Swiss-Prot record:
Record PTM text: Highly phosphorylated.
Location of the region described as E7 terminal domain in the Swiss-Prot/TrEMBL record: 1-37
Organism placement in taxonomy: Viruses, Monodnaviria, Shotokuvirae, Cossaviricota, Papovaviricetes
Description of its domains: The E7 terminal domain is an intrinsically disordered domain, whose flexibility and conformational transitions confer target adaptability to the oncoprotein. It allows adaptation to a variety of protein targets and exposes the PEST degradation sequence that regulates its turnover in the cell.
Physiological role: Plays a role in viral genome replication by driving entry of quiescent cells into the cell cycle. Stimulation of progression from G1 to S phase allows the virus to efficiently use the cellular DNA replicating machinery to achieve viral genome replication. E7 protein has both transforming and trans-activating activities. Induces the disassembly of the E2F1 transcription factor from RB1, with subsequent transcriptional activation of E2F1-regulated S-phase genes. Interferes with host histone deacetylation mediated by HDAC1 and HDAC2, leading to transcription activation.
Name of the molecule in the record: Protein E7
Length: 86
Protein backbone atom coordinates (compact mmCIF):
# COMPACT_ATOMS: atom_id res chain seq x y z
CA UNK A 1 0.00 0.00 0.00
CA UNK A 2 1.55 3.21 -1.17
CA UNK A 3 0.18 6.69 -1.11
CA UNK A 4 -2.01 8.63 1.27
CA UNK A 5 -5.22 6.63 0.66
CA UNK A 6 -5.64 2.85 0.76
CA UNK A 7 -7.41 1.12 -2.07
CA UNK A 8 -9.27 -2.18 -1.99
CA UNK A 9 -6.69 -3.91 -4.18
CA UNK A 10 -3.99 -3.13 -1.57
CA UNK A 11 -5.77 -5.02 1.22
CA UNK A 12 -5.20 -8.76 1.44
CA UNK A 13 -7.99 -10.42 3.40
CA UNK A 14 -6.84 -14.04 3.39
CA UNK A 15 -3.51 -15.06 4.80
CA UNK A 16 -2.30 -18.65 4.81
CA UNK A 17 0.55 -19.93 6.98
CA UNK A 18 3.71 -20.75 5.11
CA UNK A 19 5.76 -23.85 5.78
CA UNK A 20 9.22 -22.43 6.25
CA UNK A 21 11.88 -24.76 7.63
CA UNK A 22 13.33 -23.25 10.78
CA UNK A 23 16.47 -25.32 10.76
CA UNK A 24 17.89 -27.70 8.19
CA UNK A 25 20.15 -29.46 10.70
CA UNK A 26 18.87 -32.81 11.90
CA UNK A 27 19.51 -33.96 15.43
CA UNK A 28 21.62 -37.11 15.67
CA UNK A 29 20.23 -39.96 17.77
CA UNK A 30 23.17 -39.57 20.17
CA UNK A 31 22.39 -35.88 20.69
CA UNK A 32 18.73 -36.70 21.33
CA UNK A 33 19.55 -39.19 24.09
CA UNK A 34 21.86 -36.65 25.74
CA UNK A 35 19.06 -34.07 25.76
CA UNK A 36 16.75 -36.33 27.78
CA UNK A 37 17.32 -35.90 31.51
CA UNK A 38 17.40 -39.01 33.66
CA UNK A 39 14.37 -39.59 35.86
CA UNK A 40 14.69 -38.03 39.30
CA UNK A 41 13.46 -39.95 42.32
CA UNK A 42 13.50 -39.31 46.06
CA UNK A 43 15.63 -41.67 48.16
CA UNK A 44 15.69 -41.94 51.95
CA UNK A 45 19.18 -42.54 53.31
CA UNK A 46 19.68 -43.82 56.86
CA UNK A 47 23.21 -44.03 58.23
CA UNK A 48 25.15 -43.29 61.43
CA UNK A 49 27.18 -40.35 62.59
CA UNK A 50 30.79 -41.49 62.34
CA UNK A 51 31.67 -39.86 65.68
CA UNK A 52 28.79 -40.64 68.07
CA UNK A 53 26.93 -43.38 66.13
CA UNK A 54 23.56 -41.62 66.37
CA UNK A 55 21.27 -42.39 63.43
CA UNK A 56 21.25 -39.85 60.62
CA UNK A 57 18.42 -39.61 58.12
CA UNK A 58 18.38 -37.60 54.94
CA UNK A 59 16.38 -37.52 51.73
CA UNK A 60 18.04 -36.94 48.38
CA UNK A 61 16.46 -36.50 44.97
CA UNK A 62 18.61 -37.84 42.17
CA UNK A 63 18.86 -40.37 39.37
CA UNK A 64 19.49 -44.08 39.89
CA UNK A 65 23.12 -43.69 38.80
CA UNK A 66 23.66 -40.83 41.26
CA UNK A 67 22.29 -42.79 44.23
CA UNK A 68 24.70 -45.61 43.36
CA UNK A 69 27.54 -43.08 43.30
CA UNK A 70 26.45 -41.78 46.73
CA UNK A 71 26.38 -45.34 48.02
CA UNK A 72 29.95 -45.88 46.86
CA UNK A 73 31.04 -42.64 48.54
CA UNK A 74 29.39 -43.65 51.83
CA UNK A 75 31.04 -47.06 51.67
CA UNK A 76 34.37 -45.37 50.95
CA UNK A 77 35.90 -42.29 52.52
CA UNK A 78 32.86 -40.00 52.77
CA UNK A 79 31.70 -39.73 56.39
CA UNK A 80 28.54 -38.00 57.60
CA UNK A 81 28.60 -36.23 60.96
CA UNK A 82 25.61 -35.05 63.00
CA UNK A 83 25.27 -31.35 63.96
CA UNK A 84 26.19 -32.09 67.60
CA UNK A 85 29.58 -33.53 66.67
CA UNK A 86 30.66 -30.74 64.32
Amino acid sequence: MHGPHPTVKDIELSLAPEDIPVCNVQLDEEDYTDAVEPAQQAYRVVTECTKCSLPLRLVVECSHADIRALEQLLLGTLKLVCPRCV
